[in-house]
Amino acid sequence: MEDFVRQCFNPMIVELAEKAMKEYGEDPKIETNKFAAICTHLEVCFMYSDFHFIDERSESIIVESGDPNALLKHRFEIIEGRDRTMAWTVVNSICNTTGVEKPKFIPDLYDYKENRFIEIGVTRREVHTYYLEKANKIKSEKTHIHIFSFTGEEMATKADYTLDEESRARIKTRLFTIRQEMASRGLWDSFVNPREAKRQLKKNLKSLEPCADLPTKVSHRTSPALKTLEPMWMDSNRTAALRASFLKCQKK
């Protein structure tokens, strides 16, 4: 799974996910399913934000990469991917500026057009179940919830999906592609049900005699399909801005 993640996702996404896991004392090399889940969630958050701007009349517009509109304001503030201290600093700044209610938990995005925080969910389970879990945890009607699944389903607060249909379709297509690539490598079942995968693995290992030639790592080969999974949503200017904002690494 770790090899798949590093081959499938943009290096910046991988770096942010590693940083987030290490902040909580987790190892991406051991908790590989969580590593994949965090990368997927980060990518969905970035895709949710990219190409969406607010013009001088405070109207929401969509601008594809390469258009000369550098002065436009991004519609969404990305909070996910920052360390906890910086994330709360951003949240507090938004609340002080806009007057919106401060959330109890760190949200993923802030929508400057609708003036609300957004919690993004990506689930391997049924969307309604995951939505209710999110709502029960957040316990706030002020934070908007939007759930996506790997099967193309989605659910949002009051059926308000925020984005246009085409933008949401890009996210759904990407999630479906990730699922297909995992399945083709035999990784999907363990990603959906890690406990069952662990139990089955132990059972299988017990039936095997000790052998020095047993494989211990996932294949490093990249499938032809993965080579086409370039993250088109990540234009160079956006990548540079995000890297400068999120990753404050000193040059060695």
UniProtKB/Swiss-Prot annotation:
GO biological process: viral RNA genome replication; viral translational frameshifting
Gene Ontology MF, one: RNA binding
Active-site residues, record numbering mapped to chain: 80, 108
Marked site positions, Important for efficient shutoff activity and nuclear localization: 195, 198-199
Keyword annotations from UniProtKB, A to Z: Decay of host mRNAs by virus, Eukaryotic host gene expression shutoff by virus, Host cytoplasm, Host gene expression shutoff by virus, Host mRNA suppression by virus, Host nucleus, Host-virus interaction
Keyword match Zinc: no
Superkingdom of the source species: Viruses
Subcellular localization: Host cytoplasm; Host nucleus
Pfam families with a match to the protein in the record: Flu_PA
Site location (Important for efficient shutoff activity): 202-203, 206
InterPro entries reported in the protein's UniProt record: PA/PA-X, PA/PA-X_sf
Family, per entry: Belongs to the influenza viruses PA-X family.
Comment field on protein domains: The probable endonuclease active site in the N-terminus and the basic amino acid cluster in the C-terminus are important for the shutoff activity. The C-terminus acts as a nuclear localization signal. The C-terminus is recruited to host protein complexes involved in nuclear Pol II RNA processing.
Function, in words: Plays a major role in the shutoff of the host protein expression by cleaving mRNAs probably via an endonuclease activity. This host shutoff allows the virus to escape from the host antiviral response. Hijacks host RNA splicing machinery to selectively target host RNAs containing introns for destruction. This may explain the preferential degradation of RNAs that have undergone co- or post-transcriptional processing.
The protein's name: Protein PA-X
Lineage, broadest ranks: Viruses, Riboviria, Orthornavirae, Negarnaviricota, Polyploviricotina
